[in-house]
Amino acid sequence: MKKHKTQTIARIALILGILVVLNIISIRLFGRLDLTSQKVYTLSDASKNMVGALDDRVTLKAYFTEDLPAPYNSNRRAVLDILNEYKAYAKGNLQYEFINPQGEKGEQDAQQQGIAPVQVQVVNEDKLEVKRGYLGLVMLYEDRKEVLPVIQNLSSLEYDISSALKRLTTRTKKKIGYTTGHGEADISAMRQTYQAVSSQYDLTPFDLSKGEPVPSDIAALLVISPQSRFQDSAKYQLDQYLMRGGRIAFLLNRVNANLQMRMGQPVDLGLEDMLQQYGTRVNPDLVRDVQCANISVLQQQGGFTFQSQVPFPYIPVASNFNANNPIVKDLQSIFFHFVSSVDTSGAAGKGLKTEVLVRSSKRSGRQTGFFLIDPFQRYTPADLAEDGIPLAAIVHGSFKSFFEGKQPPALVTSSPETRIVVVGDGDFMKDDFLGNRGNLTFLANIVDYLADDAGLITIRSKNVATPPLEQVSDGTKRLLKYADLIGPPILIVAYGLFRWRRRVAFKKAIEAQG
């Protein structure tokens, strides 16, 4: 008996010892099973290549207060895991250390580095207290420094670190131009969009109305939501910039829609003939889609006025993306605001190649001619019979000048291999119309694509987002509704009958044996 007890204690001690050793090993080694569809928690090839190409040592100082409550306590481990991965691929050129800012001197050091304290609520002995904590990262490279003051959003952690490393190790930023002079949207006034793009690029306004050439050091040019007609002098500068190998994004509103007036009017931008020369066009129509966002409207009933949410087909929530293009392949959804269809049927005849980036859903349609925009309008199946209307596209190849054989004569009549992006909505990136993170990522990915920075696209597009719900028919909705009402009682009754029959059978079996 005593021997058996000793053996049991020895086995328990051995198991505990093995568990302790495994725990120590798991802390020192980074190894995670990533079951997310987009491998959100796995370091991307772009990040691996970036740190693998470092030519000098980068030092990272992680200022993290220990013993913080949930959910902040998981942030430290997440940062530790990902820094271990970066270090493994950096070929000895990346080192990190964790610092717990304690006392006045420790906090002063963190704040001098640009790490601001955050207020964290802590429950201590049934009392709610506020504790100062630090959750920041400092990166040092040669005589340069980048700071991530607060790390809270773990889903974008890799992008935050990799983009900071890119800024830290890149000597000069590429210039991205955005046109002015025709009522275009001012990207510097779009707070979120400006922050997302300006962190990696030098954003430069350029007034096309002056008729001056687009500077050659502008890597890509954005034409965002112009309101007035382009004269030939402005079109000439766009054309010649493209002929010199420049890249352009045309983000255009072909219909000026006013929800308050419930009407819309076509907009003549004067760009249609030039875009057709480039194999594409934005049609003067509005795309409606069953897969759409809700809007708030005022309704009257019984003498009362109240606000309600109604689905509005002219704000499509697009999720039909080109799975082979890095701009959109990892996005979940984009909210468009009065979007027009894009036509690229003329590209093939000009020797150009196209890729449709975004399409409408399987149940969509278009409004043309006289535009009536009524949130309460009922649509027939025929109104929503189109499948996959193109909403954004790329045209690439060697373009022919729109001004060849015209006045003023083209200095350059054909371009080297280059590309343009065309989107039938010029508002999707504005602060008022950002439906979700997908809109911002879409615009930033377009800029990266035109500026030849595909690496950041793949990192940024990784996110833990919920895809839009699949649309179901009214008949399926009714079936699910009644199944939800009737199904549970039927299951309970069936289970009761099953138990009752088992008891009866068991009782009969006992009586038979007796």
Label every PLM stretch briefly:
Residues 121-144, 312-327, 484-485, 492:
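Extended, charge-rich low-complexity interaction segments
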Residues 170, 186-455:
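Acidic, S/T/G-rich, low-cysteine, solvent-exposed domains in lumenal/extracellular/periplasmic regions
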Residues 2-59, 163, 167-173, 281, ...:
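Extracellular ligand-binding/catalytic regions of CAZymes and related secreted enzymes
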Residues 94-100, 131-136, 211-214, 256-261, ...:
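Low-complexity, flexible helical/coil segments
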Residues 178-186, 293-303, 463-478:
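Amphipathic alpha-helical surface "interface" segments used
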Residues 82, 237, 308-310, 478, ...:
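A general marker of short, structured functional hotspots
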Residues 6-228, 232-239, 253, 258:
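Juxtamembrane extramembrane loops of integral membrane proteins
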